From Swiss-Prot:
Gene: purA
Entry superkingdom: Bacteria
GO molecular function, one term: adenylosuccinate synthase activity
Residues holding IMP: D14, E15, G16, K17, N39, A40, G41, H42, T130, R144, Q225, T240, R304
Name under which the protein is recorded: Adenylosuccinate synthetase
KW Cytoplasm (keyword) present: yes
Record-listed GTP binding positions: 13-19, 41-43, 306, 332-334, 415-417
Native source species: Enterobacter sp. (strain 638)
Keyword list, A-Z: Cytoplasm, GTP-binding, Ligase, Magnesium, Metal-binding, Nucleotide-binding, Purine biosynthesis
GO cellular component: cytoplasm
Length: 432
């Protein structure tokens, strides 16, 4: 039996993590976010009602679950308050269910201004960030000048620290990026207005998780973005600013790494990517348009159209290695319904003619790569809403089996629609 279960994306994000986390939290006592910020977009559909969460863990909708934002998350007070209000307006008692680490770095207005100014300065070489200040906030953390939730316990000292760091960043904004300075007093007033709310939710997360482990409580760790966007293992520099891999659980929450029992990798039945960066299987034809339309591939956070392509098994195998995956959850299988044939990328042909079965690390090394495909029959029958494996078309079952063979990882959960109920749990991670 696994008490501590990690759910993370195996591709470039947008794999459908939010629904699966919400489904599995039926048995969990705690749900923990351990990296990223409000650049995530987790969509839940429960009894036909759609909820999009960006910062708050997906367990917040359940009254028997405590949601935790760990130290690895960069926290925007403004974004948190907006998200809390939206949920509280629907009668969800967020403040009774949400806890924060005092070590969470804060995202403030100057981080957003820097993010936007830098992307503008990059021009055609823009990374494609969400413009929400995530990268600059992590940068401040590593430079040891960042302000954290815990700093709000001493408001006078916080004000002094804020003034110092804003002088530094405003100098950059005005003199290097030729942008407007950010107003110190407004930033201070805005954060002080919510300081007591934030500090009122602070808890020692590492100790809480250790006590939960000793009691045998079930804990779900909710990843944001995807493995191929990891700051170290992703398609650098077209990556996010945090560790999206399973290793980020320990550093971003304070749980000892030996205590992770099961790692569930969410894998979409095809590939998508938002923003710039390598994407060997990207489709620019009618099939690519079909996948986008059928899969409603528009970002929950930015609204941007996602790039679409065939499932890249080579890239997913890298995710298997890095995360030591225990099992997969396959999502959006129904999007492939109606295609005469489906393809899996099983290797890459390099510019010099070599054939390889592993991914490069640096983005430049992806230049000129051609996907090597294995083609399989498609299926005309619908898989949407199917709730038993026996109800799937044989061609869909063959597709699932081939993914398992190529990755050497079992598919333990199959999602056939956006609602909680449209899911087949073949092996429950908490029972594995």
């Amino acid at each position: 039996m696994g008490n501590n279960v990690v759910v993370l994306g195996t591709q470039w994000g947008d794999e459908g993590k939010g629904k699966i986390v919400d489904l599995l939290t039926e048995r969990a006592k705690y749900v923990v976010r351990y990296q990223g910020g409000h650049n995530a977009g987790h969509t839940l559909v429960i009894n036909g009602e759609k909820t999009v969460l960006h910062l708050i863990p997906s367990g917040i909708l359940r009254d028997n679950v405590t949601s935790i934002i760990g130290n690895g998350v960069v926290l925007s007070p403004a974004a948190l308050m907006k998200e809390m209000k939206g949920l509280e307006d629907r009668g969800i008692p967020v403040r009774e269910r949400l806890l924060l680490s005092e070590a969470c770095p804060l995202i403030l207005d100057y981080h957003v201004a820097l993010d936007v100014a830098r992307e503008k300065a990059r021009g055609a070489k823009a990374i494609g960030t969400t413009g929400r200040g995530i990268g600059p906030a992590y940068e401040d953390k590593v430079a040891r000048r960042g302000l954290r939730v815990g700093d709000l316990f001493d408001k006078a000292t916080f004000a002094d620290k804020l003034k110092e760091v804003m002088e530094y960043h405003n100098f950059q904004l005005v003199n290097f990026y030729k942008a407007d300075a950010v107003d110190y007093q407004k930033v201070l007033d805005d954060v002080m207005a919510v300081a007591d709310i934030l500090t009122g939710m602070v808890v020692d997360v590492s100790d809480l998780l250790d006590q939960a482990r000793k009691r045998g409580d079930f804990v779900m760790f909710e990843g944001a973005q995807g493995t191929l966007l990891d700051i170290d293992h992703g398609t650098y520099p077209y990556v996010t600013s945090s560790n999206t891999t399973a290793g980020g659980v320990a550093t971003g929450s304070g749980l000892g790494p030996r205590y992770v029992d099961y790692v569930l990798g969410i894998i979409k039945a095809y590939s998508t990517r938002v923003g710039a960066g390598p994407f060997p299987t990207e489709l620019f034809d009618d099939i690519g348009e079909f996948l986008c339309k059928q899969g409603n591939e528009f970002g929950a956070t930015t609204g941007r159209r996602r790039r679409t392509g065939w499932l890249d098994v080579v890239a997913v195998r890298r995710a298997v290695q890095i995360n030591s995956l225990s099992g997969f959850c396959l999502t959006k299988l129904d999007v492939l319904d109606g295609l005469k044939e489906v393809k899996l990328c099983i290797g890459y042909r390099m510019p010099d003619g070599r054939e390889v079965t592993t991914t490069p690390l640096a983005a430049d090394d992806w230049e000129g790569i051609e996907p090597i495909y294995e083609t399989m029959p498609g299926w005309s029958e619908t898989t949407f809403g199917v709730k038993a494996r026996s109800g799937l078309p044989q061609a869909a079952l063959d597709y699932i089996k081939r993914i398992e063979e190529l990755t050497e990882v079992p598919i333990d959960i199959i999602s056939t629609g956006p609602d909680r109920s449209e899911t087949m749990i073949l092996r429950d991670p908490f029972d594995a």
